[in-house]
């Protein structure tokens, strides 16, 4: 698919950042092996990546596993082809950072109209956007929505793009808007059988921030079967359209708790505390149309 000049600018900036991030993380992971456990936290590959890339590091994120991760913003005006840029971002992330064809991408969309339009395009195997994803995955792309069955095997053998709609989050509606991650249908394969408390305890040691309950009469943990927990286990790449609408403190904590490896947001009006990777101006869009 033909990219416009400003879209090429975005993709090139993302490529450079992802390659720097991958190289830095790899070298830091090796260096950590030589350090005692109580000193390993002093090595922050994300901060070094920002410094190397000459980018401001304002939004310093830590996921639910206690690991730093990048949360980047692409500033692009409305009409700048964000869906195409999101697809290109998935391709570059898989190729340069994850370095694999499989995994989980959580694509968060802010409105019903944008949600239905985007899902329709990406589901259509004849659509150029879907074809770009299929090239990336080797024709093993699965498009899912909340409530549809998701298994560990799906993620291990395919590139799974899971669409979630979260409308604007404020202090007053935060808990209600984020209930989407409590959905409990179709995620059984991620969790041990209910009577295997030993395996539940083992999984909690690996992923300590999973939601769990302790059944009456026992102090043993029982991990909750939920979309949020399935995502936490999978350590996803998260894309957020109009990220300024889901950037309240409550929303950021929720995103952090999903244990992302990387978050990429799109916004025409990013907030001052966001990490902006690249800015596209209205003039650049206008010049492209001339």
Tell me what each language-model feature is:
Residues 1-290:
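RecA-like P-loop NTPase motor core of helicase/translocase proteins
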């Amino acid at each position: 698919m033909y990219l416009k000049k400003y879209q090429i600018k975005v993709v090139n900036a993302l490529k450079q950042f992802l390659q720097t991030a991958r190289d830095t993380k790899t070298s830091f992971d090796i260096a950590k092996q030589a350090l005692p456990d109580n000193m390993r936290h002093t090595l922050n590959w994300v901060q070094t990546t920002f410094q190397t890339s000459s980018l401001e590091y304002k939004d310093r994120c830590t996921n639910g596993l206690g690991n730093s991760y990048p949360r980047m913003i692409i500033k692009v005006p409305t009409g700048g082809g964000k869906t195409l840029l999101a697809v290109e971002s998935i391709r570059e992330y898989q190729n340069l950072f994850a370095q694999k064809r499989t995994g989980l991408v959580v694509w968060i969309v802010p409105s019903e109209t944008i949600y239905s339009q985007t899902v329709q395009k990406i589901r259509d195997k004849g659509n150029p956007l879907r074809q770009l994803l299929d090239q990336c995955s080797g024709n093993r792309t699965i498009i899912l929505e909340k409530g549809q069955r998701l298994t560990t095997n799906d993620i291990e053998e395919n590139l799974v793009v899971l669409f979630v709609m979260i409308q604007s989050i404020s202090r007053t509606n935060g808990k209600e808007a984020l209930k989407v991650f409590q959905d409990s249908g179709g995620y059984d394969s991620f969790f041990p059988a209910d009577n295997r408390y030993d395996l539940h305890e083992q999984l909690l040691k690996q992923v300590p921030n999973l939601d769990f309950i302790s059944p009456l009469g026992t102090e043993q943990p029982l991990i909750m079967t939920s979309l949020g927990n399935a995502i936490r286990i999978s350590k996803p790449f998260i894309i957020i359209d109009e990220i300024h609408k889901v950037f309240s403190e409550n929303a950021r904590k929720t995103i952090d708790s999903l244990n992302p490896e990387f978050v990429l947001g799109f916004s025409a009006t990013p907030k001052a505390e966001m990490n902006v990777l690249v800015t596209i101006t209205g003039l650049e869009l206008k010049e492209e149309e001339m």
